[in-house]
Swiss-Prot record:
Its main location: cytoplasm. This is HTH-type transcriptional regulator SarZ. One of its GO terms (cellular component) is cytoplasm. One of its GO terms (molecular function) is DNA-binding transcription factor activity. The lineage of its organism: Bacteria, Bacillati, Bacillota, Bacilli, Bacillales. It comes from the Bacteria. InterPro entries: HTH_MarR-typ, Transc_reg_Sar_Rot_HTH, WH-like_DNA-bd_sf, WH_DNA-bd_sf. Belongs to the SarZ family. The gene is sarZ. Keywords: Cytoplasm, DNA-binding, Transcription, Transcription regulation. It comes from Staphylococcus haemolyticus (strain JCSC1435). It is found in: Cytoplasm. Residues 9-139 form the HTH marR-type domain. Residues 55-78 bind DNA.
């Protein structure tokens, strides 16, 4: 589809919005088969295998607050992908780890991510340049450590 040259079509915010919406729509299509949302995908992929991470650190990693993460993690726990454990020394500190199922689904989720970008008419170089540009914008302009 061609975007007509206009004021709106030259606005970075609009272009990021459309791109994000369409990419997430593709992810949603593939993730539906695994009863996962895009946000669930992000959380599973953000937790390293064998890692214990608290909600605050996980939230910083995926740019989500604890109010959004808590119900999502409860759903992922019910589905068997993560385990939530309270620290014995500090009951307020909730640690999250991937279960065996969570670790085992990661290759499938990576394949979905690869498929999403294969579905778009974008070269590897274009993708790499876009990713690097967006990382630069995020790291130089947004501080999520306060959330």
């Amino acid at each position: 589809m061609y975007i007509k040259d206009s004021y709106l079509s030259n606005q970075l915010c609009f272009l990021l919005y459309v791109t994000s919406k369409e990419v997430i729509k593709k992810y949603t299509y593939y993730l539906k088969k695994h009863d996962l949302t895009y946000t669930s995908f992000m959380v599973i992929m953000a937790i390293e295998n064998e890692e214990k991470i608290n909600i605050k650190s996980l939230g910083r990693r995926v740019f989500l607050d604890s109010g959004t993460l808590t119900p999502l993690l409860k759903k992922l726990e019910k589905k068997g992908y993560v385990q939530r454990m309270r620290e014995k020394e500090d009951e307020r500190n909730l640690q999250i780890t991937l279960t065996e199922s969570g670790i085992n689904i990661k290759p499938t989720l990576k394949a979905i991510s690869d498929q999403v970008f294969e579905d778009f008419d974008i070269s590897q170089d274009e993708k790499d340049n876009l990713v690097n540009s967006l990382k630069h914008v995020i790291s130089n302009n947004f501080d999520y450590t306060t959330h």
